Amino acid sequence: WREKRMKKVMWIVAMIPVVVTSVVLQFMPDIIPMHHDLEGNTDRWGSKTESFIFPVIILFITLFWHLLIYVFEKKSKNANTEKEQMEAKSSAKVLCVVGISQAIMFGIMHYFILYSSWIQANAGGEHAVIDIAKVSCILCGIIFIVLGNFMTKAKRNAVVGVRTVWSMHNDNTWRKSNRFGAICIIITGLLTIITTVFTSGMTGTIFMLIYLLLATIVTVVYSKKIYDKEIKK
């Protein structure tokens, strides 16, 4: 039942941008800024109805998560052992959290985009009012922290968590690799937020990618180290 409630929440959150956009567009000019260059200058204006594109994309991404969750729920029902059932259930729960987090993050991004477009269109300006890249990076940082706290709850599987040849060796290598990976992704989130607050959105994005790359490399190396220790036992 918990997964069913979480899936309902995921779809409700995913639908909110569609509803908000439908209402907000009633008060918007027919032509609004649709795209900006790296410096925030508007390089394309378009019909306000184009604002529905992002909410529709959010719905399709949510559908993807819904189908993936369904696969694990089916695996749980058809599991031959209790261990397999628990692993599938755990993965389904984590995917629910991922789906909800993604819908919230993209939704907030869309609200900022709508607000910025509304202000700029009414003012007749040629420059973005809000640095959307900055907002996106901060939201990504928050999502990293949230996901990091849930990574350790995922049982061994082929979809969710730190999945290397070495981490998949057994439950012990999986648990230790994911615990370390969770710490790395949380630190990545914190560093991304701190960096972005004091820099531009573009700079924050570059540093976020660097942090992610370093976190990935360190986690993979640690996973191999844990595996080597495990096979020597």
Where are these regions (language model features)?
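Small-residue-rich transmembrane alpha-helices that serve as helix-helix interface/gating elements
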Residues: L139, T205-T219
